[in-house]
Amino acid sequence: MQATKTDVRTEEFMLDYLDNAVVGLHWVDGDAKILWANKADYEPLGYTEDEYVGHSITEFHADADVINDILERLLSGQSLYNYKARLLCKDGSTKSVLIASSGLFDDANNFVHTRCFTIQDPSTT
């Protein structure tokens, strides 16, 4: 089946939408490796795409117990809503965020990656 011009254009719009969204979006695999992230996920922390994507998400969390709990919950099939966390900025400061995330599982119920949305915690602004 060939992609039509409309299909290609729709895909371009969707990729632009995701990459330029005003909330942070990322996918993390079962080994905690960041597979993909949009600009709103890494730029507010002071990182470039190369400094962020491909690295372990644990490198960017200030509290090991928090990210370990997040990963454990997602790997077991739970979803998260407004989960508070502190992220590490490149300059050494931290940002308080709220995380909403769920896991993507394949037909054999194997974990594929997270579907994570990150916003700045409004109670800290």
Regions found by a protein language model. Give the residues of each.
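PAS-associated C-terminal cap
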Residues: 1-13, 119-125
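Sensory modules in modular signal-transduction proteins
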Residues: 7-30
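PAS-family sensory domains
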Residues: 29, 35-36, 61, 82
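PAS/LOV sensory domain surfaces, especially short acidic/polar patches at coil-to-helix junctions
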Residues: 31, 35, 39-43, 55
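A short beta-strand signature of PAS-family and PAS-like sensory folds
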Residues: 33, 84-86, 101
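PAS-family sensory/regulatory domains
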Residues: 39, 51-64
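Terminal output helix/cap of sensory domains in signal transduction proteins
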Residues: 63-93
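PAS-family sensory domains and close relatives that share small-molecule sensor folds
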Residues: 89-91, 100-106, 117-120
